[in-house]
């Protein structure tokens, strides 16, 4: 069963009336004033209009691409190291978990944790799945698709996260 994948900017169809940033994946990054009071910017200056697309695309929201021959997940995990990340496949799902213990930053102590779960298409070759973390903190999980009728090999296993030294060239669509 394939699931339709929606691009993140569709979620902002209602513009400033839709406070979705509060629920997006922002690991330790503060909220802006317009996140709590979306009407404030339009009341101060009726000509001011904040960029809807830039904030959503740069926000750390995951992106899933599924084309004819490949399935790819991009996830911004810039606050986590490969040791903090666990990626495993269970049946038709990939689970990505990140957690780092409490550590000191500029404002005190902080700990972060997230858990994402994605359904894999039925024709993804699970024996050839790979996962890498770029230098700029972009996690890329990918797997080739097999022709229909060929066994894709479903089993439970952990996928190691490899470290890349170059920045990601991923989701800037």
Curated annotation (Swiss-Prot):
Taxonomic superkingdom: Eukaryota
This protein's encoding gene: CRYAA
Basic and acidic residues: compositionally biased ranges: 153-167
Binding positions for Zn(2+) 3 per the UniProt entry: 154
InterPro entries with a match to the protein in the record: A-crystallin/Hsp20_dom, Alpha-crystallin/HSP_16, Alpha-crystallin/sHSP_animal, Alpha-crystallin_N, HSP20-like_chaperone
Free-text description of this protein's post-translational modifications in UniProt: Acetylation at Lys-70 may increase chaperone activity. Undergoes age-dependent proteolytical cleavage at the C-terminus.
Name of the protein described by the UniProt record: Alpha-crystallin A chain
Binding site for Zn(2+) 1: 100, 102
PROSITE patterns (UniProt xref): SHSP (PS01031)
The protein's role, per its UniProt record: Contributes to the transparency and refractive index of the lens. Acts as a chaperone, preventing aggregation of various proteins under a wide range of stress conditions. Required for the correct formation of lens intermediate filaments as part of a complex composed of BFSP1, BFSP2 and CRYAA.
Family designation: Belongs to the small heat shock protein (HSP20) family.
Residues that carry a glycan: 162
One of the GO BP terms on file: protein refolding
């Amino acid at each position: 069963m394939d699931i339709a994948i929606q691009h993140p900017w569709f979620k902002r169809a209602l513009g400033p009336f839709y406070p979705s940033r509060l629920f997006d994946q922002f690991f330790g990054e503060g909220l802006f004033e317009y996140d709590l009071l979306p009407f404030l910017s339009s009341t101060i200056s009726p000509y001011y209009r904040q960029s809807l697309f830039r904030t959503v695309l740069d926000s750390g929201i995951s992106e899933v691409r599924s084309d004819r021959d490949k399935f790819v997940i991009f996830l911004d995990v810039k606050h986590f190291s490969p040791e903090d990340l666990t990626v495993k496949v269970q049946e038709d799902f990939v689970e990505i978990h990140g957690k780092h213990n409490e550590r000191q930053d500029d404002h005190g102590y902080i700990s972060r944790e997230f858990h994402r779960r994605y359904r894999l298409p039925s024709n993804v070759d699970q024996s050839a799945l790979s996962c890498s973390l770029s230098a700029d903190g972009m996690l890329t999980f990918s797997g080739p698709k097999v022709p229909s009728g060929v066994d894709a090999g479903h089993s439970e296993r952990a996928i190691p996260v490899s470290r890349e030294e170059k920045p990601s060239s991923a989701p800037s669509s």
